[in-house]
Amino acid sequence: MQMRSKKDILEIKKRILQNFAEERSELKFKDTYQLLVCVMLSAQCTDKRVNLITPRFFAEFPSVKELAKANLASVKLLISSCNFYNNKAVNLIKMAQAVVRDFDGVVPLDEAGLKSLAGVGQKTAHVVLLEGAGANVMAVDTHVFRVAHRLGLSRAKTPELTERDLSEAFKTDLGKLHQGMVLFGRYTCKAIKPNCKECFLNELCSSKDKNFP
């Protein structure tokens, strides 16, 4: 459920796009396979940490076919500095095996195909689609969720319903808005001590957190 007027929504959208016009994901990847692995690893883990892990990972498993044949212990060792590495290692191998078996070794770029893979939920699928295919989809992580609620763009209690509210509010440029909101939440509208004084959305903010020290 949206809480802002159409005028406010359009202004918020315009400012986010203006301030993050050329921004891309901070994850480092070269192709769709690497993108999917990075996004799967990034759950409950910082992009910086993922970027430290992946060079050795991709040197060991340069394609989905190599990962599909990987030894579980080897994958765990390579990603052990990442949160929930045990589950992620299992899902990475299962994901790769499914891509080889069901998609001829090519990571699918449709939502149903992606969500059929182990460890891939709606958020992960949407990030892969917007980054890998330029799809007009929204993805809600912890930063986007926080920003959406502080700006009064949603009252929803789940990421999925928040995604629906944002998609209905913004309609277009959803991928760019997702990336802008991620970076805005990461560096300006932080969970603790948000930088309200230098915020380009300050006067449009409806959050109680606006006066945080």
Locate each region found by the language model:
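Catalytic cores of DNA base-excision repair glycosylases
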Residues: Q2-P213
